[in-house]
């Protein structure tokens, strides 16, 4: 987030907070959901460029070049989806952006695993190029399992530790994507150990996939350097991994497990700081009607999780998970990603502010995102010529 280190921006924001110059955008009349204390309190928000300059008592300032009156609505930080695959939704990044941004999701962490398994480094390059100018913030990760099953398939590339290390050296890459080859990591196999070590050496997160791991195997996976998991199988699995110290990403794609997770968290009596939310895989129709991570928040609350906890998991905890101190909190000095909600059950976004700009209203983006051409990836499915023998069958009697 180096743009927020701009000295002139900070001076302008400081002057606006003092009252010596107007805000670029003033949001007034809202009720702030405080992700630190859990309180609901009336507050106005002054924004300069992409930065929150002031969170102050309602009605104490009226000087904004643009004023957004949200009287009675709730103010939440923008939602952060800490693990997802655009490919699973079978849409382009620009289409995905417009589908979720309109509902309050302002940051997603993309593992372009399928792109890389077909197209290799050019697939990862496309993920970066196709997202860099979108109003939805994409944190692109370096796929760790290309191919996903070494020796068992014909992938379009082979990412060893050196390849992953090269990707991690790029500032656009936010970490190592989910490490699915758990057994080789636990066994200390050189290839996977080297990939995990590349993430540690780069000082970037190493994301996990710890489905079914328990006891010594789980401890070994974590000791290798993997820090998170989204592949929970039960409430007891959730609690073991929380107690072990993994950062848990509750995912919405296994809806049947969410009530069990909610029951365990409610029994615990508080939301751990190491619980964030993710979608992982969302089918196109669910994306269209649910809005991505917003729908996960909505369902968790419907199953009985306090709305403040669900939002904290989707904002402040998510920011902590991805190491972004500029996100996840409505406070002076933080990035101005804000969603304005009419209530805390339906979670319908009245307005969405991303990077200091109003980008959506009543579930629709104000400007459609621009597509980046994908021509190099056309005709990439290579099959033998279709013959009559290929579709013939023998009738069995």
Outline where the language-model segments fall.
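C-terminal cap of metal-dependent C-N hydrolases
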Residues: 334-376
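Divalent-metal coordination cores built from histidine and acidic residues
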Residues: 3-16, 96-205, 268
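Hydrophobic faces of well-ordered beta-strands that scaffold small-molecule active sites
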Residues: 80-82, 108-110, 138-140, 177, ...
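Histidine-rich, glycine-flanked metal-binding segment
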Residues: 4-77
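His/Asp/Glu-enriched, well-ordered alpha-helical/loop segment
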Residues: 223, 265-347, 353
């Amino acid at each position: 987030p180096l743009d927020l280190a701009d000295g002139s921006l900070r001076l302008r924001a400081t002057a606006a907070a003092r009252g010596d110059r107007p805000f670029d955008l003033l949001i007034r009349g809202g009720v702030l959901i405080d992700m630190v204390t859990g309180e609901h309190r009336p507050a106005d928000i002054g924004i300069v460029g992409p930065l929150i300059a002031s969170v102050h008592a309602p009605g104490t300032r009226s000087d904004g070049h643009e004023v957004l009156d949200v009287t009675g609505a709730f103010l939440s930080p923008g939602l952060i989806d800490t693990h997802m695959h655009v490919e699973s939704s079978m849409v382009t990044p620009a289409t995905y952006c417009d589908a979720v941004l309109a509902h309050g999701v302002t940051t997603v962490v993309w593992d372009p695993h399928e792109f890389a398994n077909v197209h290799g480094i050019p697939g990862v390059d496309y993920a970066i190029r196709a997202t860099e100018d979108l109003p939805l913030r994409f944190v692109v990760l370096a796929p760790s399992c290309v191919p996903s099953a070494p020796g068992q398939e014909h992938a379009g590339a082979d990412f060893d530790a050196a390849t992953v290390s090269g990707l991690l050296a790029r500032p656009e890459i936010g970490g190592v994507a989910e490490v699915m080859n758990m057994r080789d990591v636990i066994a200390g196999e050189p290839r996977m150990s080297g990939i995990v070590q590349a993430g540690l050496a780069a000082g970037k997160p190493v994301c996990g996939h710890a489905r079914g791991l328990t006891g010594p195997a789980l401890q070994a996976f974590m000791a290798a350097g993997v820090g998170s998991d989204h592949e929970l199988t039960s409430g007891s699995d959730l609690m073991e991994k929380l107690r072990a110290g993994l950062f848990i990403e509750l995912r919405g794609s296994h809806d049947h497990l969410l009530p069990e997770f909610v029951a365990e968290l409610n029994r615990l009596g508080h939301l751990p700081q190491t619980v964030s939310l993710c979608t992982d895989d969302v089918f196109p129709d669910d994306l269209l009607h649910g809005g991505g991570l917003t729908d996960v928040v909505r369902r968790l609350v419907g199953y009985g999780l306090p709305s403040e906890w669900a939002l904290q998991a989707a904002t402040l905890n998510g920011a902590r998970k991805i190491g972004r101190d500029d996100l996840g909190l409505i406070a002076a000095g933080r990035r101005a990603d804000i969603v304005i909600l009419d209530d805390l059950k339906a979670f319908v976004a009245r307005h969405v502010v991303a990077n200091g700009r109003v980008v959506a209203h009543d579930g629709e983006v104000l400007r459609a995102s621009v597509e980046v051409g994908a021509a190099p990836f056309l005709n990439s499915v290579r099959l033998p010529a279709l013959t009559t023998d290929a579709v013939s069958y023998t009738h069995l009697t």
